[in-house]
Amino acid sequence: MNGVLIPHTPIAVDFWSLRRAGTARLFFLSHMHSDHTVGLSSTWARPLYCSPITAHLLHRHLQVSKQWIQALEVGESHVLPLDEIGQETMTVTLLDANHCPGSVMFLFEGYFGTILYTGDFRYTPSMLKEPALTLGKQIHTLYLDNTNCNPALVLPSRQEAAHQIVQLIRKHPQHNIKIGLYSLGKESLLEQLALEFQTWVVLSPRRLELVQLLGLADVFTVEEKAGRIHAVDHMEICHSNMLRWNQTHPTIAILPTSRKIHSSHPDIHVIPYSDHSSYSELRAFVAALKPCQVVPIVSRRPCGGFQDSLSPRISVPLIPDSVQQYMSSSSRKPSLLWLLERRLKRPRTQGVVFESPEESADQSQADRDSKKAKKEKLSPWPADLEKQPSHHPLRIKKQLFPDLYSKEWNKAVPFCESQKRVTMLTAPLGFSVHLRSTDEEFISQKTREEIGLGSPLVPMGDDDGGPEATGNQSAWMGHGSPLSHSSKGTPLLATEFRGLALKYLLTPVNFFQAGYSSRRFDQQVEKYHKPC
């Protein structure tokens, strides 16, 4: 993760772990690349500041709610409060980072001095002409993109790298061109190639939506055969795909990146086209700004050689009292409220999840025997039911048809079937169900004859949810045990009621009222009637 918590401030940039955010209260996103959005998801519930393009992509692709996204115009200064009473404020200015669509640098100004966070950026001399950087401001801390901060790594400019790609394509006039890209970035390169070779560039629907948002030239399509230049995911550029593509049409692949990649096929070409500043560009940028200190953004990479370009360091700023209260309160009260809000908004699990009939049909006989032995080992014998309570996750005393006036009607009842956890609105399979006489009115005579039901079941036993209410589990599971036991006041379910219970558990109430049958449910019944 490439993000920072700026010390002695409530500011966090590209940092989305609330557990480690401490006193951070203001969150900023530089761009939408995945290494800068680790921990950011649809559950995010705090104000977040970014550029308008990033705001659109953030809501579109990560489903972050719009109520938390604050889009700030690029090139303009914005005043934000640093406490709860508006006594202390700071100014933040967004500058184009020349990295990918929507990427920006953040210039923070406040009691802490002046801080510039570059994020990922590709330096150009025109950046020094930004009004926010030309007013003689002293940069106290420069958070620098040090991805390519290595004197041994020499990179061409993007114009030079683009020229190399054009020359390579010209050497293969009859070939299809596969250009491997990440999910965001290098759209301007694709536009340049399309205009250079007067051909359509084939994109995925997702990237096409992006280029339309950027307002680029109308040179992109999703039709596979419309043009010979195809933008694909960089992971698709591999040896096996090269063989497959060349079987139908001569194809070369281009990876525009500064990373060291071993080419697994002679037609895969790596061109050092980078959206990160080269070492020489970083040196020029730091020398022009003369910050008091340089802090690398990518902690795993080296970042040195700037000592001769630094200004004298200043002392640690004093945090105003109102800001201290603002920062300390953010680590306690909001976190508790945020957790409560998330719990209240959590969707209630409803419905039934069944095991796939195809999966059950594909089980081997050995697996079924193993499950049968396990059930026999775990299931108590009828004679033991009086001596020990049921240890099944549920001890249910529930009507076959739910009481519409009961408060429990909307509650999901968890149960386990075939070692899979599911939820159900009625009593689970493998348990006797306590029927009441009022249930009989739901069952028509035609339905009784269809499922082989004789006389109605007479309810007996206690109504207090004790051990008697659990019934005879062995009789339901079909282990050949007697269908009754010595416990007094326990409802007895004969063999013919197995089809009834299964059908009613798997079938909604309106199914019986309609008076028709379902082949899928019959298959479920046949499966459970088959001997193990």
Swiss-Prot record:
Changing D35N: In Apm2; abolishes exonuclease activity and function on telomere maintenance. In Apm1; abolishes exonuclease activity and function on telomere maintenance. It is found in: Chromosome, Telomere; Nucleus; Cytoplasm, Cytoskeleton, Microtubule organizing center, Centrosome. Its main location: nucleus. There is a cross-link at K333 (Glycyl lysine isopeptide (Lys-Gly) (interchain with G-Cter in SUMO2)). GO terms for cellular component: centrosome; chromosome, telomeric region; cytoplasm; nuclear body; nucleoplasm. Changing H276A: Slightly affects interaction with SPAG5. Beta-lactamase activity is inhibited by sulbactam. Residues 350-392, 453-482 are annotated as: Disordered. The keyword Nucleus applies. Its EC number is 3.1.-.-, 3.5.2.6. It is an enzyme of class 3 (hydrolase). Signal peptide: none annotated. GO terms for molecular function: 5'-3' DNA exonuclease activity; 5'-3' exonuclease activity; beta-lactamase activity; damaged DNA binding; protein homodimerization activity; protein-containing complex binding. CDD domains: apollo_TRF2_binding, SNM1A-1C-like_MBL-fold. A motif (TBM) lies at residues 496-511. 5'-3' exonuclease that plays a central role in telomere maintenance and protection during S-phase. Participates in the protection of telomeres against non-homologous end-joining (NHEJ)-mediated repair, thereby ensuring that telomeres do not fuse. The TBM domain mediates interaction with TERF2. This is 5' exonuclease Apollo. The gene is DCLRE1B.
